[in-house]
Amino acid sequence: FRSIASMPNTLDGEFDLNDELSVEARTILAAAANRGTIDIRANQDSFNSAERFLAVCVESELEQRLLFLQKENPEQTVKFLEGFRQLCQHGLVIHHLQRDFSLSALGFQFARTLDTKDYESSLKFASEIDH
């Protein structure tokens, strides 16, 4: 709880999060703005090594999940994972249990300032998954 207590709780600050966060981090926020649910996934049984990478999965709508992983583009997959790390670093995400995360109150607040249309091309990297 010490780490939660030390998190920023307002967007008023000395720096601009738009400058601090990568486009991948902001894309994750834009995708998560409605539900705020994020988890980290891996497919350890895949033959392809890039499919075994850790990947960010966002519940963008109820029962709609976006997985930011493409075996054909491992570099971009890693950029989205790095974007998630940035969200954690800035207190925009809270860790719950195991692989489960959510936006923090500050994360929801900042996500709602973003225009999803600005991230349409980045969102195309993600694939919709069933579970």
Q: How would you name each of these model-derived features?
A:
Residues 1-42:
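Long, low-complexity, charged/polar intrinsically disordered regions in eukaryotic proteins
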Residues 22-26, 81, 85, 105:
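Non-catalytic, well-ordered alpha-helical scaffold segments
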Residues 32-36, 91, 111-114:
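Generic structural signal for hydrophobic core residues of well-folded globular domains
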Residues 40-49, 120-121:
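A composition-biased, non-transmembrane "mature-region" signal
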Residues 47-77:
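Short helix-coil junctions and helix-kink-helix linkers
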Residues 70-90, 95-97:
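Short amphipathic alpha-helical interaction segments
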Residues 100-104:
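Minor-groove-contacting beta-hairpin "wing" of winged helix-turn-helix DNA-binding domains
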Residues 106-131:
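Short, amphipathic alpha-helical interaction segments positioned at domain boundaries
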